[in-house]
């Protein structure tokens, strides 16, 4: 199943002594009376985490508008802020747009059309929930619509792995990753074809209502209309583009279902993004004029692909206030690390917590979702040691690394062991919300570690969205403001009862 969690947060602008005991400014009434679970100062702002206040699920055999399994959509979510409201009975409602990644791929990537799911959310707070008196799920998630994505000509996008070499282009667009497939792209008969490969991982809504979507294959950022047609494509600097044998190679070494033994040689790109480590993080400024996109972990020219060394992740900033996106700045985020309890070699045990999402905060800082892997529901291990929504903050000391030398194909800002070059200062990184606290999870019968049961947290938490506790109030400088942080998990379409209407394909996951 796909799961969702809601946390209560407070953001305080400026250095206010009142934040120590959680008191609001004079004349500003707090909407929640929860105790402070965690308080952190990052840059010039102080933040409070007041606990888990909501939980909901979607059955793993649910289907979308087109009859395909409603899975994987926790890759990223975006809330229509104008839709978020508090009802007279104290409940909350709003509309979320959620994006799945490239589809069910346990046995190989598929020719599944990329899509966005429109969801209705309803939250009924459970203020009396405790570990000894837990609440049932209190977040309702309802499918409202499914939007299919196409290229500029209206041809469906695909989740198939991109070709080892080559690309596809259209007037006014850069060369984009393409999959050339035989038959129907599922192993059956058909005419074959070529489609843009998309492994979507991030989504935001622009001021014009269009969707910006970040991708792992390119890694690129695409703009789609409300009808799902591609309008623009942002190609990042050459340093991000994967290259094998000195040539552009968009393949992620993820063979298709009809050719599961296909080999990619070399498997890892020598430079650029590593396989399945593309643009996981995408967010937009509060005024809708600036896009930020963050690579999941270090480029292979900056310390990747080894987990021990891939902690120096690059962030790009684009001005989207005009008709054409403009690349303006580039920064470094030094990702968190943790000790892998299952690694027998102590010299290899400290590894990078790759990030799965970023979210712009009203203060100008960012939330960043960093986590471990292979721990949780249906995973190899049940206990996760690192799942956090942390904070990153840019200051006057943060280095803008945008330059021709850093952005060229083999440009590097760190050693092969992930040590930043002299003179580069990354964004401040501050620990904040810990997903794994059983003292909070238990309020909704959830747990981290222990039995493989229906209450064990899913492995892949990959999305962040922020909505106000009091939707009638705007953000006030130097004031205390309260928000719900909504996070969805990506279940990778894991199910024993899956279906794809594309060719009446029925599937189940061996890992379930």
UniProtKB/Swiss-Prot annotation:
Signal peptide start-end: 1-22
Pfam families, per database record: Phytase-like
InterPro entries: Phytase-like_dom
Keywords: Glycoprotein, Secreted, Signal
A Gene Ontology cellular-component term: extracellular region
Localization per Swiss-Prot or TrEMBL: Secreted
Region Disordered, residue ranges: 251-282
Residues annotated as glycosylated: 167
Domain of life according to the entry: Eukaryota
Name of the protein in its database record: Uncharacterized secreted protein ARB_04696
């Amino acid at each position: 199943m796909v799961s969702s969690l809601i946390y209560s947060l407070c953001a305080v602008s400026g250095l206010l002594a009142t934040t120590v005991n959680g008191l609001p400014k004079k004349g500003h009434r707090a909407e929640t009376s929860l105790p402070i679970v965690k308080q952190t100062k990052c840059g010039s702002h102080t933040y409070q985490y007041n606990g888990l206040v909501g939980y909901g699920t979607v059955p793993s055999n649910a289907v979308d508008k087109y009859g395909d399994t409603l899975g994987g959509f926790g890759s990223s979510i975006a809330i229509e802020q104008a839709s978020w409201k508090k009802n007279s009975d104290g409940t909350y409602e709003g509309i979320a747009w959620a994006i799945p990644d490239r589809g069910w791929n346990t046995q190989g990537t598929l020719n599944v059309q990329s899509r966005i799911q429109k969801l209705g959310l309803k939250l009924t707070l459970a203020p009396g929930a405790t570990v000894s008196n837990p609440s049932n799920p209190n977040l309702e998630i309802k499918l409202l619509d499914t939007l299919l994505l196409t290229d500029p000509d209206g041809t469906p996008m695909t989740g198939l792995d991109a070709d080892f070499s080559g690309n596809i282009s259209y007037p006014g667009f850069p060369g984009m990753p393409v999959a050339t497939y035989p038959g129907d792209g599922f192993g059956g008969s058909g005419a074959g074809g070529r489609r843009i490969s998309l492994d979507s991982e991030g989504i935001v809504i622009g001021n014009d209502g269009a969707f910006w979507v970040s991708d792992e294959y390119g890694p690129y950022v695409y703009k789609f209309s409300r009808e799902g047609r591609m309008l623009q494509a942002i190609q990042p600097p050459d340093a991000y583009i994967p290259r094998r044998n000195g040539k552009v190679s968009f393949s992620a070494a993820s063979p298709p279902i009809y050719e599961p033994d296909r080999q990619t040689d070399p498997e890892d790109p020598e430079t650029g993004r590593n396989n399945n480590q593309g643009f996981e993080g995408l967010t937009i400024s509060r005024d809708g004029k600036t896009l930020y996109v963050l690579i999941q972990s270090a480029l292979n020219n900056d310390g990747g692909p080894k987990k021990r060394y891939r902690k120096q992740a690059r962030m790009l900033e684009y001005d989207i206030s005009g008709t054409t996106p403009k690349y303006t700045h580039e920064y470094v985020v030094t990702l968190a690390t943790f000790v892998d309890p299952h690694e027998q070699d102590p010299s290899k045990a400290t590894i990078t917590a790759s990030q799965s999402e970023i979210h712009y905060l009203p203060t100008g800082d960012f939330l960043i979702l960093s986590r471990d892997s292979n721990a949780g529901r249906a995973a190899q291990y049940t206990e996760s040691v690192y799942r956090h929504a942390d904070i990153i903050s840019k200051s006057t000391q943060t280095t803008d690394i945008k330059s021709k030398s850093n952005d060229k194909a083999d440009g590097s800002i760190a050693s092969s062991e992930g040590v930043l070059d002299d003179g580069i200062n990354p964004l401040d990184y501050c620990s904040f919300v810990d997903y794994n606290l059983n003292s909070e999870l238990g309020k909704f019968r959830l747990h981290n570690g222990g039995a493989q049961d229906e209450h064990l947290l899913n492995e892949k938490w990959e999305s962040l969205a922020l909505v106000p506790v009091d939707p009638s109030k705007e953000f006030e400088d130097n004031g205390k403001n309260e928000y719900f942080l909504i996070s969805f998990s990506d279940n990778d379409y894991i199910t024993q009862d899956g279906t794809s209407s594309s060719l009446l394909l029925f599937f189940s996951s061996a890992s379930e």
